[in-house]
């Protein structure tokens, strides 16, 4: 029987809660010649899911259901005649579905996409080299967006990072920073990666691959990093400062920590000046300040407020590192589809130590 019920977690605007809605889908007619249909087995949540919900203002012409989530892992169940033969029925795939307020999201049973447009897709490879308790779909749903974000910071700003490079990571305990240190060490062979985190997270982050760790809870942050800089690092400044949590401590003293702009050094942020607060409006004066800084041509340093492109490169690399046993995505918790609200509450708590994954359909 070609007709199925497609469940999805949706919302109308920021005054309506997330809820499960259903729609009949004809699997023989729902896709174009250039599209594939993926049965999603697992998806994961990201802060952007909460942010776009909070920004969905109630408007008279905007009453259609909108969907959650971008990361997915599943199986191709249908493929159009013009789809590249690389993508076949029964292939297991993982990806990051790019959308803002779209009719489709990955927190649903089925996803229809054109892989030549939605390029952030790769095949799921063998995961047996990893010491993990998670099935391949749950494991793979946890990495596309965070890995792609880390990859973009390291590769897309014209820097030539390598053994002589030094990177400072603000927020070493995040999933993005975890991915970044793995790429920096296993792919780029970056000589020195310094992480900032709580003193309680030192052991965990040292095992992740950071060369040095600086506590944010034992004194003024710039002073603590400064001690490492003038001591162990012999006053050699950083090629890249990557902020994955939202911080503004270094802007007044940037020249003391970041190499000159002429050497193509960069300060890259994915969160702006302050840590996300899911109980407040996501766009405020601090957001405006970050946007102004990114657009200001008179800065004395290179600054980027990163957005994630839809690219194949980071998907292929992430899948390869997982297959090689060199990268195991961090997972905080796994929820069943019906418990989506508990999963969202966990994300909003800011206490998750890794990705929050939602299982949608069982592995076959």
Swiss-Prot record:
Alphabetical keyword list: Lipid droplet, Mitochondrion
SMART domains on file: PKS_ER
Record-linked SUPFAM superfamilies: GroES-like, NAD(P)-binding Rossmann-fold domains
Subcellular location: Lipid droplet; Mitochondrion
One Pfam family this sequence matches: ADH_N
Signal peptide: none
Highest taxon above the source species: Eukaryota
One Gene Ontology cellular component: mitochondrion
GO MF entries: oxidoreductase activity
Family annotation (CDD domains): AST1_like
Location (main, coarse): other
InterPro entries, per database record: ADH-like_N, GroES-like_sf, NAD(P)-bd_dom_sf, PKS_ER, YIM1/Zinc_Alcohol_DH_Fams
Listed Gene3D superfamilies: Medium-chain alcohol dehydrogenases, catalytic domain, NAD(P)-binding Rossmann-like Domain
Family, per entry: Belongs to the YIM1 family.
Record-given protein name: Protein YIM1
Source species: Zygosaccharomyces rouxii (strain ATCC 2623 / CBS 732 / NBRC 1130 / NCYC 568 / NRRL Y-229)
Name of encoding gene: YIM1
């Amino acid at each position: 029987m070609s007709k199925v019920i497609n469940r999805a977690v949706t919302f109308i605007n920021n005054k309506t809660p997330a809820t499960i809605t259903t729609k009949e889908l004809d699997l023989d007619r729902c896709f174009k010649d250039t599209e594939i249909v993926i049965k999603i087995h697992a998806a994961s949540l990201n802060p952007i899911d909460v942010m776009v919900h909070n920004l969905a203002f109630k408007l008279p012409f905007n009453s259609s259901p909108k969907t959650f989530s971008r990361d997915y892992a599943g199986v191709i169940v249908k493929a159009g005649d013009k789809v590249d033969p690389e993508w076949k029925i029964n292939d297991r795939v993982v990806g990051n579905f790019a959308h803002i307020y779209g009719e489709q999201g990955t927190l649903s049973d089925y996803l229809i996409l054109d892989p030549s447009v939605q390029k952030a897709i790769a095949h799921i490879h063998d995961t047996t080299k990893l010491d993990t308790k998670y099935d391949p779909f749950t494991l793979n749903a946890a990495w596309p967006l965070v890995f792609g974000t880390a990859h973009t910071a390291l590769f897309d700003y014209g820097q030539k990072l390598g053994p002589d490079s030094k990177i400072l990571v603000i927020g070493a305990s995040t999933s993005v920073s975890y991915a970044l240190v793995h790429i920096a060490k296993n792919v780029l062979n970056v000589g020195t990666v310094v992480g900032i985190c709580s003193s309680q997270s030192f052991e965990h982050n040292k095992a992740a691959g950071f060369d040095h760790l600086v506590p944010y809870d034992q004194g003024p942050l710039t002073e603590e990093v400064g001690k490492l800089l003038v001591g162990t690092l012999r006053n050699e400044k950083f090629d890249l400062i990557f902020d994955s949590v939202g911080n503004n401590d270094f802007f007044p003293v940037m020249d003391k920590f970041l190499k000159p702009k002429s050497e193509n050094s960069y300060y890259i942020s994915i969160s702006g000046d302050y840590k996300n607060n899911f109980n407040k409006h996501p766009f405020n004066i601090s957001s405006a300040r970050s946007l102004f800084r990114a657009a200001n041509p008179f800065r004395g340093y290179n600054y980027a407020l990163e957005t994630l492109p839809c690219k194949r490169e980071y998907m292929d690399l992430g899948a390869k590192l997982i297959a090689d046993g060199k990268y195991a995505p961090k997972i905080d918790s796994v929820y069943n589809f019906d418990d989506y609200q508990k999963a969202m509450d966990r994300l909003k708590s800011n206490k998750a130590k890794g990705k929050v994954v939602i299982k949608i359909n069982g592995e076959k």
